[in-house]
Amino acid sequence: MIHLILDSTSGVGADFLALHPNVHCISLTIEMGENYVPESEATIKAVIDYSEATKKSVPTSQPSTGDFLKLFSDIPAEDPIIVLCICSTISGTYNGALLAARQSGRKNITVINTRTTAIGMIHLLEDGLDMIQKGLSYEEIAKALEEASMRTGLTVALDTIDYLKRGGRIGKAAGLIGSILKIKPVIYLNENNEVDALGKVRTTKKANALMIDYLKKQEPLKRLGIVHIENEAGAKVLYDKAKEMYPDMDITLTTATPVLTAYLGPGLTGFIFERAK
């Protein structure tokens, strides 16, 4: 049996895991004061409340090497494993998984930097499960998912730059710091998989237009998802626009996870996509 492992920033649900014994989730950890909470047990509200009360970053930590090794050991040695990790420039999870795979001594583990997160990782998971169902080999599936990860992308509009700034993940979007008040920073992952500034505008309408223009430049698309953090109304606006553009595409609207909230803050809306071949 081929096994697929995702990290908790994917947002994969417990019900889904219960239905798929070959799919596993490994949790990142959120630090709020003296409390270390697995992301799977944390809430978005708790992260926001802590950050707003302290005006500090909410530290997160990747799964430990031991966590990965324990999960690997729970899977039969003869069963191949594909690990799908959050974008490596946002979290060290990918590098940690690579180290654990080497230490395990197993030759049948492939670790993939998905270059995405949230619904983007779920899209890759769904593709992996579909290929397993069709009877493709471990090597074929790993290669296909590696290639698909190179076609992923995202762009999001932030309600605040504070969370990126506090957490030190601002990357090439540093130029947004100190900008005029009440702007809508729009970021994306550039060709080097780094957080970069797409632009800064004053209104949500202009932020949406900027993201839509960027999305059009990525066409043709294979998959598209809408993501938000405590902004379902804003996400619904993007969803409606996306359905107008791609009426035949199955577009998913979903919330991000507590770790992504610690990185990016509340109010976010945006697109996560995979380009067609």
Regions inferred by a protein language model and the residue ranges of each:
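Class I S-adenosyl-L-methionine
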Residues: 35-103
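Mixed-charge interfacial surface used for oligomerization/domain docking
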Residues: 3, 8-34, 73, 80, ...
